[in-house]
């Protein structure tokens, strides 16, 4: 497959094809298959099957990468615009093809100069480049007074915009999270998990760690009103895989770790809050609890909170250090970390157990009744 991947140049196999760009604004971090812009984009791309057209697509945002995936599924030719780099561009093409599951016989890659530009500036340059290159532009869901609408307004006099399939723009709804009653957690769950370390999950913005984008898009299109990578589905994936996947987000030296908290569930509940800066919850009421001795034997260690920016001692792994933050709120999480993925295989219910707070409360109340 990698041998067949090619760059778009003067000898393009799509010479004579009519180029099409489908224009969508950003809609939010947690889309579902029921979102109108996704359904309309899918229908338009599948309507192009068998036509002598080539779709202009790109990467770097969900609305562009979804089109790459849909074009591959519909058997529609595409030219994927990627940031140009002095080195490793061929590797980037291979990775993109693998992640999005594109058909190498129907795909070419076109580099777009991106040197010395930040991500936002490149995104504007990419969108303008695609719209100017296209023979036909199909707006689907464009945010009023947004950057994309401004670009379309400039291009409109050229007469290549087909607005016949455009729908009203509506941002994706927020992520619904139902938290259990704090008193019930304190009275029912805290005694069960006293002293245990808990890894709390949250919704994933896009693919799970270790998951290909094409698998995420497959599930997104099949989903209805529920986001396919919600905290609950992440929790279910951990149980089915018997593995907690590590993340390097905000960890020294980008060391992938699995984080745990020593807080009783009722206290952890107070920290489950929406974080506007990251457009997500800190964590949600679905966790994996590990018995203390098992945690220690498995290599889970307590995080050391630093008062100063000075480098930590070399004899202690860097991933165990964490700055206190400007408000000094990191220590209240009582965090522990495990280097790399945490394997649940072979651990008994006495050593590790799921901590779905709502389910634990419901089961206990039913047993009492």
Where are these regions (language model features)?
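NAD-dependent ADP-ribosyltransferases
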Residues: 165-369
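Glycine-biased, small-residue-rich flexible motifs in mid-sequence functional cores and linkers
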Residues: 1-188
């Amino acid at each position: 497959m990698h041998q067949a991947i090619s760059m778009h140049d003067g000898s393009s196999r799509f010479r004579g094809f009519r180029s099409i760009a489908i224009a969508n604004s950003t809609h939010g971090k947690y889309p579902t298959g029921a979102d109108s812009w996704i359904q309309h984009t899918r229908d338009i791309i599948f309507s192009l099957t068998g036509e002598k057209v080539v779709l202009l697509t790109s990467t770097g945002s969900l609305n562009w990468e979804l089109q790459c995936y849909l074009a591959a599924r519909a058997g529609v030719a595409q030219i994927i615009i990627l940031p140009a780099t002095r080195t490793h561009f061929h590797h980037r093409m291979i990775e993109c093809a693998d992640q999005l599951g594109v058909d190498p016989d129907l795909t070419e890659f076109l580099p777009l100069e991106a040197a010395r530009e930040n991500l936002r500036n490149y995104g504007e340059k990419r969108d303008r480049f695609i719209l100017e290159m296209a023979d036909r532009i199909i707006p689907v869901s464009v945010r009023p007074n947004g950057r994309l609408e401004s670009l379309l307004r400039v291009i409109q006099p050229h007469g290549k915009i087909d607005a016949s399939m455009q729908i009203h723009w509506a941002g994706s709804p927020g992520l619904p999270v139902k938290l259990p009653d704090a008193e019930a957690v304190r009275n029912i769950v805290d005694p069960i998990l006293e002293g245990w370390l808990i890894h709390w999950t949250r919704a994933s913005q896009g693919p799970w760690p270790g998951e290909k984008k094409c698998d995420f898009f497959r599930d997104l299109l099949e989903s209805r009103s529920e986001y396919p990578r919600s905290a609950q589905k992440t929790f279910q994936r951990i149980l089915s895989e018997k593995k907690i996947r590590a993340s390097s987000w905000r960890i020294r030296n980008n060391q992938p770790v699995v984080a745990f908290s020593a807080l009783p569930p009722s206290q952890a509940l107070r920290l489950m809050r929406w974080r506007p800066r990251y457009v997500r919850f800190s964590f949600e009421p679905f966790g994996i609890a590990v018995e203390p001795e098992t945690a220690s034997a498995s290599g889970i260690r307590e995080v050391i909170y630093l008062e100063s920016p000075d480098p930590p001692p070399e004899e202690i792994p860097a991933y165990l250090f964490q700055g206190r933050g400007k408000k000094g709120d990191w220590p209240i999480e009582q965090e522990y970390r495990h280097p790399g993925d945490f394997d649940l295989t072979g651990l008994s219910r006495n050593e590790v157990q799921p901590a779905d707070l709502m389910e634990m409360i419901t089961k206990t109340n039913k047993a009492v009744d």
